[in-house]
Amino acid sequence: MPDQGQPHVASLAAARGALRERGLRLILDFVPNHVAPDHPWVAAHPDYFIRGDAGDAARDPASFLDVDGHVFACGRDPFFPAWADVLQLNAFNPGLRAAIAATVNAIADQCDGVRCDMAMLMMNDVFERTWGQRAGARPAADYWPTLISAVRARHPGFRFLAEAYWDLEWALQQQGFDYCYDKRLYDRLREGHARPVREHLQAALDYQIKSARFLENHDEPRASASFDPRVHRAAAVITYFLPGLRFFHQGQFEGRKITYRELAADRGEEEAAVWREERRAAVVAEPEDLDDSTAGK
């Protein structure tokens, strides 16, 4: 974890304090499934990773990466090609589980919760289906209950939000998550048929209150661009007047119609990066008085 004396850590603490003054909590992003090839664990703890051999790297160089003579599996979602720029952590390794618990406890010293990227990938059932014998012996305890209980022993009020798909939201709620993405409701609203939406909302209240509702996020198109205006208003009423967590994306209130990725593709990465830095500086300088020159774009 970064040194508490580093400027960006101090800035994070200031941001957290400003949020608290406004009755808000700070949630940071946590990626449990994979790390970059230059992560210190690659050299110090290669057993924390799903491993391969020279044959794997030769047969499938898009899925296995040689790092200083050691072959590691690249991170992956089982339904898509591997992410060639990251290495897959082994959720079944007890040493990794202990290290992750220490890491998240350190993160919990600096914020009020974490959004867990692709949380379902670390569930025992999913991980075993994805990696088979490469993962080794399946632990008796599941990944998330073990981690969540370890963190809450030190930080009782710490919140866990799961990015979740494949209709595993309920299972993740039962494993300790405070909230899970309600991607199913989003998809049904996008499809525009009333009956599936109505049936979805008939789920039990204890499921509903732990659902995170959204109309856009960094992986989805802008709501202002993807919904017809009349449908958009109705979808917003349904989404944000339901029990549970209300999830809003940067730029959603201003009605932005393009994402940063689209901006980079349209204007070039350099111009998009300049715009992003200008926005960041504006937020730091005047967080309550922003002139958003991209509103409606």
PLM features: residue spans?
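Active-site and adjacent substrate-binding regions of carbohydrate-active enzymes
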Residues: 1-297
